[in-house]
Amino acid sequence: MCSTCANVLKYYDWDPHFKLVINPNNFLSVGFCSNPLMCCYPELLPEFGTVWDCDRSPLEIYLESILGDDEWASTFDAVDPVVPPMHWGAAGKIFQPHPGVLMHHLIGKVAAGWDPDLPLIRLEADDGSITAPEQGTMVGGVIAEPSAQMSTAADMATGKSVDSEWEAFFSFHTSVNWSTSETQGKILFKQSLGPLLNPYLEHLAKLYVAWSGSIEVRFSISGSGVFGGKLAAIVVPPGVDPVQSTSMLQYPHVLFDARQVEPVIFCLPDLRSTLYHLMSDTDTTSLVIMVYNDLINPYANDANSSGCIVTVETKPGPDFKFHLLKPPGSMLTHGSIPSDLIPKTSSLWIGNRYWSDITDFVIRPFVFQANRHFDFNQETAGWSTPRFRPISVTITEQNGAKLGIGVATDYIVPGIPDGWPDTTIPGELIPAGDYAITNGTGNDITTATGYDTADIIKNNTNFRGMYICGSLQRAWGDKKISNTAFITTATLDGDNNNKINPCNTIDQSKIVVFQDNHVGKKAQTSDDTLALLGYTGIGEQAIGSDRDRVVRISTLPETGARGGNHPIFYKNSIKLGYVIRSIDVFNSQILHTSRQLSLNHYLLPPDSFAVYRIIDSNGSWFDIGIDSDGFSFVGVSGFGKLEFPLSASYMGIQLAKIRLASNIRSPMTKL
């Protein structure tokens, strides 16, 4: 023990010959680092205690340890702390742990060797005014009961959580569609044990670091007596990935019939080898609902399947507890619940490819986009931030040139301007002249009627497929007003660099700008601020629908169907040049989703969806699932006509191999 540490102990009337040593790294269980508090997570060190350097004065350390005590702050009475400073030999420092942290660590070590055969003392309140009858049939005996001893040990180590009346009743968790087309072994629902199973637990989980205990689940079937069929509720132990096979029925399970009137209740136990789970722990007991016998409806036929709805409700089990209280604003290192990826009203939805409002959804076999698309690792394969603002470039030209390469002045990827659009031109162009839009007979289209009734629209414009930008163009000595700019990603070619060729990969040499910058014979450098306003691709298919024209740096993120769920684009539109019309734009994400994924680390397994229920003004609804790559999926094959505005609500986490639920009303005609 160093002399400083020994002298500090004298002030507490402790024997300085005692060697009080400590290693705070033992408070933080990190398998990949042996010194996490000095290496990977130094910002967490103040949560465990106070650190002093050994070259500090012993009296100064003593006074600081007293002044930091809550007793001094309230009464100004100097009280020696319960735990004195100790020697942290590996770091060469003096460390004083918080008493609660040290006690939690010591009791945790004791509880690790807990003997479940020891007698327990049960304390119960004598107030029986809060009661809740069990409205259902309790099923038990098929699985091991939760360990009350483990729960008691966890409480002793971390503190008792708050009791409340919400623990006594079942709360809605989700609903599952069960149709006559689902075959035996089909998984309809899968959810890992954890606070996400119950809305109250999910809310309270924001105040804690860890949890433990079981959850009771109640199933209700909305079918009628004409139905036949059975479902199996299966308890899958940690570490096992559910598969769509009847082999899953070898695990503990209970059966419930489609004709059953009373709900079925059973307990989902917490099978664990530790005192508690951190909020990041997804390897827990799983609840799986699987088709045991096919659903039968004698009034259905091959052309028209029917079904019923299974409602899932939950409440915490008697042994469920939260542990390790934390301030609400503290961020956990493992990630948070993905409950805020879609705004609650569609009035706030704009695309991540263009900034107009989302007006529809488009189901496609494949969905792809690199720029401004983010995944659950906060990563993007693109070059733009999740916001829309003017693009900033400089352009150097001479000899009267109007076509040049922009140099980025605002960027996150060197050389590529932040916000640069992500599609290329359809073919080789020599930008010049005016718009040239004709019909099938070669006549110019000059009216709305002529455009809407044209059997063929030919776009012979020499700058077609480029984006139209309002421009603030400045150059020293240039007194003329700014002109409209046309921009794209392409390669510059030709004898006088007057030709551009399409290219779907981007770098600093492909930032093409077509604009009259009033350039003479001498070289002129213009500072350009460009606001994206329109598009010259008159008569083209939707922007972003052609994979070969979508620009990427190197990798193009892409997805296809998953488990009967289809990927979707979010559709909005951009104004066309010349004709007073618009063209559709396909977006891989709502811009709010892109922004949230870029700013926050969310917790989502790669085999699961974060599910949101979308409801239109007529009451039709369907679920959208967002996977860990940031793409969106639906379980329907078509939407029909949705009545905007739409509303969105977070439904929880669902296995990606399970078809997403929907209830879209058929269009009705009144004679």
From Swiss-Prot:
Superkingdom of origin organism: Viruses
Instruction: Read off the Gene3D superfamilies from this record.
Output: 2.60.120.20
Q: Keyword annotations for this protein?
A: Capsid protein, Disulfide bond, Host cytoplasm, T=3 icosahedral capsid protein, Virion
Positions of the record's site feature: Interaction with host receptor F11R/JAM-1:
479-480
Q: Where is this site: Cleavage?
A: 124-125
Q: Name one GO cellular component term.
A: T=3 icosahedral viral capsid
Instruction: Write one Pfam family the protein is assigned to.
Output: Calici_coat
- Transmembrane stretches, start-end: none
Provide the family line. Answer: Belongs to the caliciviridae capsid protein family.
Entry protein name: Capsid protein VP1
Q: Which organism is it from?
A: Feline calicivirus (strain F9)
